[in-house]
Regions:
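Post-cleavage N-terminal segment of exported redox proteins
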Residues: 2-44, 56-59, 64-69, 189-201
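Processing junctions and N-termini across compartments
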Residues: 14, 52, 89-92, 131
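Electrostatic cytochrome c docking/interface patches
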Residues: 31-52, 68, 72-88
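C-type cytochrome heme-c attachment and multiheme electron-transfer modules
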Residues: 40, 56, 103, 109-201
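Short, well-structured alpha-helical interface segments that form or flank functional binding sites
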Residues: 44, 56, 90-93, 183
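The canonical Cys-X-X-Cys-His
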Residues: 56-65, 92-103
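Short, solvent-exposed loop/turn and secondary-structure capping segments
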Residues: 62-64, 70-74, 107-111
Length: 201
């Protein structure tokens, strides 16, 4: 009996780190420590960041054109809207016409109108839909296409920005982004600390 108990305990200890370091479908930076080559580890960290970036919660507001997407199926926004000046919608049909400071659940309880202050599209230079991980990575490191951000600024944006954080609290009827904003921020910092390497393709 003692042997069985020890074996069971050993099995629990052996398996605990793997389950503890994956949170809601997103791996934490510690899971990449076994990759000895720093560039390879950095690339792997970015590829894990891309798990969040390519989710509908992020892509819907990072279109490469003037029309945002919506829903988990990433359909064109209804009612029809356009980017407009400053990425806040067209005159007379601003994003804030429907989107308030917080999510509003439908009276039926099925679905909601998303909200955050401010509610806006990412600039067109930051469009991601259809881009590969390598292309998004290069874009994020390019001040001409990332809002003139340094890597430190990018970490702060990913880790603390409220509109980014909305992706994990998207309201009724939407699947949250994988993981948590804290882990996304930690992955971003670990990627930077290992050289901010990009995937080759």
């Amino acid at each position: 009996m003692q042997t069985l108990t020890k074996l069971t305990l050993a099995a629990l200890i052996w398996t605990a780190p793997a389950s503890a370091e994956t949170v809601k479908g997103l791996r934490t930076p510690g899971e990449f420590d076994s990759i000895a080559d720093q560039t390879a580890r950095s690339t792997a960290l970015f590829e894990e960041m891309f798990v969040v970036i390519e989710s509908p919660r992020c892509l819907n507001c990072h279109p490469v054109g003037d029309v945002p997407m919506q829903g988990d199926a990433m359909q064109p926004h209804q009612p029809p809207v356009v980017r407009g000046v400053g990425d806040f919608g067209a005159t007379g049909m601003r994003c804030s016409t429907c989107h308030g400071a917080e999510n509003v659940t439908f009276t039926t309880g099925e679905g909601s109108i998303p909200g955050h202050e401010p509610w806006q599209l990412a600039p067109i230079e930051m469009g991601w839909i259809g881009l590969t991980a390598a292309e998004v990575c290069a874009q994020l490191k390019d001040p001409a296409r990332n809002g003139n951000r340094t890597l430190a600024d990018l970490h702060e944006h990913n880790a603390t920005d409220g509109l980014v954080g909305w992706g994990w609290e998207p309201g009724e009827g939407r699947t949250p982004a994988p993981g948590t904003q804290e882990i996304f921020g930690d992955l971003t910092q670990a990627w930077i600390d290992t050289g901010a390497a990009c995937p080759a393709t």
